[in-house]
Each structure stands twice: as structure tokens, then as C-alpha cells.
Amino acid sequence: AKDVXFGXDARAL
């Protein structure tokens, strides 16, 4: 996943 500002990884969401 790419950095989307939330924890650095879109997989976190």
C-alpha cells in the first residue's frame, strides 16, 4: 500500500 498519511500505510485502514 502507499502512504496516505494515516500511519503510513493504506493497509492500516
Swiss-Prot record:
GO terms for molecular function: ATP binding; isomerase activity. Transmembrane segments: none annotated. The keyword Chaperone applies. One of its GO terms (cellular component) is protein-containing complex. It catalyses: ATP + H2O + a folded polypeptide = ADP + phosphate + an unfolded polypeptide. The keyword Iron does not apply. Its EC number is 5.6.1.7. It is an enzyme of class 5 (isomerase). Keywords: ATP-binding, Chaperone, Isomerase, Mitochondrion, Nucleotide-binding. It is found in: Mitochondrion matrix. Homoheptamer arranged in a ring structure. The functional units of these chaperonins consist of heptameric rings of the large subunit Hsp60, which function as a back-to-back double ring. Interacts with 2 heptameric Hsp10 rings to form the symmetrical football complex. Interacts with HRAS. Interacts with ATAD3A. Interacts with ETFBKMT and EEF1AKMT3. Interacts with MFHAS1. Belongs to the chaperonin (HSP60) family. Chaperonin implicated in mitochondrial protein import and macromolecular assembly. Together with Hsp10, facilitates the correct folding of imported proteins. May also prevent misfolding and promote the refolding and proper assembly of unfolded polypeptides generated under stress conditions in the mitochondrial matrix. The functional units of these chaperonins consist of heptameric rings of the large subunit Hsp60, which function as a back-to-back double ring. This is 60 kDa heat shock protein, mitochondrial. It comes from Canis lupus familiaris (Dog).
